[in-house]
């Protein structure tokens, strides 16, 4: 788990201590007694707040790194300058919530509703024994925070499939590297918003009304040229499988630089050991149950790809973007080559977190994989 921005200034609570507070808040909302949850500047990292009625609760300045809010109602909730990095916020309702200055870096907000939410830049000032101090985000020591966005709402590297931002205030919001598939921005106020390197698919770009430089490096919808290559790519993968299972038939596939998204539904369960797919675009690609021993995915865009159940011994993900990729049950470690050498799986330089490999079948340590 990543360290919180606010470790030295917040009050920690355990799950056992938190549960009665949440239950009391639910009674309060239902007008059955209880008390509003006042959790400002509390440390709730990694705790379970899923499927709760949390409307109008106060989490301002709270540290909630890695917590789960799956399916909860957070309408009109106060999340002012809260730290929600790597949270599970899928299917939550954040209608008219105060989210100014909050950080959602790396979080999963897929299918969340943020209509009318206030997402403007802000910073929190705290009165203490030594006077007024500023509660600052240090961005985990990162150096690539875009200029002018240090106090902005941070959605960088988030998974935000089918999120609704209807009429939301998004001044200076940072969506760099986020997966914005099917997101609705109708009526939203988008001033000085940053989308650098984001996935913008299934979106009406006209709704964004942003200058071209704000879309630098973005992954957009599949082009007609890429769709026209589907048959050729399928044939090359079929030939690669034949090369694997036969004694001389087929040929190894070299897919470096290709857009593999048109192959969705074709790649799962295949024998693709030794595949070369460096610098490919494979956002959301389904590789489940594939045999990918010694495959090369160096510098590939594999955001939200599914490698569950794969044999990934000896695979190279060096420099790849693995944000929100899944590895449940994937086998990772070294493999012995025909000449007797051992080839180790590697993720050095990749955009990935340790939590993504929590359910993988690791035959080495994360340090052995080169995870930074």
Q: What kind of feature is each model-predicted range?
A:
Residues 2-26, 30-372:
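Tandem repeat scaffolds
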């Amino acid at each position: 788990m990543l360290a919180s921005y606010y470790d030295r200034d917040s009050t920690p609570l355990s799950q056992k201590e938190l549960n009665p507070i949440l239950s009391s808040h639910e009674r309060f909302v239902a007008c059955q007694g209880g008390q509003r949850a006042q959790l400002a500047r509390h440390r709730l990292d990694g705790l379970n707040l899923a499927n709760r009625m949390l409307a109008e609760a106060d989490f301002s300045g709270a540290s909630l790194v890695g917590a789960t809010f799956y399916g909860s109602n957070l309408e009109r909730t106060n999340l002012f300058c809260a730290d929600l990095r790597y949270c599970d916020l899928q299917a939550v309702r954040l209608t008219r919530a105060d989210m100014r200055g909050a950080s959602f870096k790396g979080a999963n907000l897929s299918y969340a509703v943020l209509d009318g939410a206030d997402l403007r830049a802000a910073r929190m000032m705290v009165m203490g024994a030594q006077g007024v101090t500023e509660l600052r985000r240090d961005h985990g020591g990162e150096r690539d925070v875009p200029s002018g966005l240090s106090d902005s709402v941070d959605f960088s590297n988030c998974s935000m499939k089918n999120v609704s931002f209807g009429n939301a205030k998004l001044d200076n919001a940072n969506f760099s590297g986020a997966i914005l598939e099917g997101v609705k921005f109708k009526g939203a106020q988008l001033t000085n918003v940053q989308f650098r390197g984001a996935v913008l698919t299934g979106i009406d770009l006209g709704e964004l009304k942003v200058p071209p430089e704000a879309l630098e490096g973005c992954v957009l919808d599949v082009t007609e040229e890429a769709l026209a290559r589907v048959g050729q790519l399928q044939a090359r993968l079929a030939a690669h499988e034949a090369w694997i299972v036969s004694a001389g038939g087929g040929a190894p596939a070299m897919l470096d630089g290709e857009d593999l998204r048109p192959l969705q539904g074709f790649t799962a369960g295949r024998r693709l050991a030794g595949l070369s797919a460096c610098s490919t675009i494979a956002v959301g690609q389904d590789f489940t149950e594939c045999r990918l021993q010694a495959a090369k995915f160096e510098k590939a865009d594999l955001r939200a790809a599914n490698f569950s159940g794969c044999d990934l011994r000896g695979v190279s993900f060096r420099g790849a973007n693995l944000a929100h990729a899944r590895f449940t049950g994937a086998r990772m470690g070294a493999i012995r080559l025909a000449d007797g050498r051992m080839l180790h799986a590697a993720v050095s330089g990749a955009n990935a977190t340790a939590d993504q490999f929590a359910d993988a079948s690791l035959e080495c340590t994360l340090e052995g994989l080169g995870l930074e």
